[in-house]
Amino acid sequence: MASGDGGDDAGVKRVADRYLKREVLGEGTYGVVFKADDTKTGNTVAIKKIRLGKYKEGVNFTALREIKLLKELKDSNIIELIDAFPYKGNLHLVFEFMETDLEAVIRDRNIVLSPADTKSYIQMMLKGLAFCHKKWVLHRDMKPNNLLIGADGQLKLADFGLARIFGSPERNFTHQVFARWYRAPELLFGTKQYGSAVDIWAAGCIFAELLLRRPFLQGSSDIDQLGKIFAAFGTPKSSQWPDMVYLPDYVEYQFVSAPPLRSLFPMASDDALDLLSRMFTYDPKARITAQQALEHRYFLSVPAPTKPSQLPRPPPKGDSGNNKIPDLNLQDGPVVLSPPRKLRRVTAHEGMEVHMHRADRTEEHPSGARHMDDMSSQSSRIPMSVDVGAIFGTRPAPRPTLNSADKSRLKRKLDMDPEFGYTE
């Protein structure tokens, strides 16, 4: 990889000139992603241009972490980092170009996913996770738009900016990772000591999202997110999760019994439901691992996973079609009944009881910070594999990301490697 060491500006410029930038693919807090042509190989690549900013902001450390980890993570289900070089005050990361992502597949109403298609996507996701965990790497930002899909249909884990080496039981990490809808309950309860089980919970949420064609648990706050989880799987008992009551931000919730998993995913196979239940196990110590999940009978039973090259994919960008997805989740969260800084007992809001959506008003699938638009008529609904109105209500919430407050906290508290000059 190009480094520009020794003040070799001409050498760095030659590396930069190798790539001919085309259109912008996306823009984030720290930089821009371009589509580009590699004049040396003739391949199309994606270049992430990162604004390095001031040293104290820590942006460059996040990029260095991603570079370091991706140099070690060479696998067919993990995005390939081709090159990295500084140029004109920015750090450029060159990745293999991927046509789309799993979120686009989920949102595209013109795509019909068969059970074999879903199985294929989940298998590739778990293969990537299993490789990361084998190398003692936590991803910590699993969500559909970080699962990229290439022209050959291959799914690959991407965006390792929050990834972390794990393994030491005494090592503390920040719990402000993952977008909220994909956070495991132990993270929502404030644990700072965790392992690969947090990635598995998020993978379970993605599995559920593929089955439902919409985000599964859409909390508007951490407490509300826990309420959504407990409404779906029941309030955990100490016998299920002995360490729960010792977590830093533990909140006692009113007991709610778990509805049958079949009622949430009526179209899923028995094997799929069994795997989901193991991925959504409350106690992280008992939660299934990625390798164990790959060996689960779900992947051995018929139908066999679809070959990646035969998977349906969304149309090119700009030809979005009708990709609006109904969303039946309730934004209101459970109510905290007792004062702060004491053991808080939380009960489910009465709005989490039966509260069905009007037939002529469905909401657009949330993405980023966009507001939701009403769909035109009942005929524009897509078939849902679960009637969740009785559990989750009706009002949509915007898809969460790591917001500015989260990022500010991460800048102060990210547990960086000592070699990057950043310690906690």
Curated annotation (Swiss-Prot):
Pfam families: Pkinase. It comes from Oryza sativa subsp. indica (Rice). Residues 303-337, 359-424 are annotated as: Disordered. This is Cyclin-dependent kinase D-1. The active site is at residue 141. Its main location: nucleus. It is found in: Nucleus. The gene is CDKD-1. One of its GO terms (molecular function) is RNA polymerase II CTD heptapeptide repeat kinase activity. Its EC number is 2.7.11.22, 2.7.11.23. PANTHER family: CELL DIVISION PROTEIN KINASE (PTHR24056), CYCLIN-DEPENDENT KINASE 7 (PTHR24056:SF0). The modification Phosphothreonine is found at residues 29, 174. The lineage of its organism: Eukaryota, Viridiplantae, Streptophyta, Embryophyta, Tracheophyta. Signal peptide: none annotated. One of its GO terms (biological process) is positive regulation of transcription by RNA polymerase II.
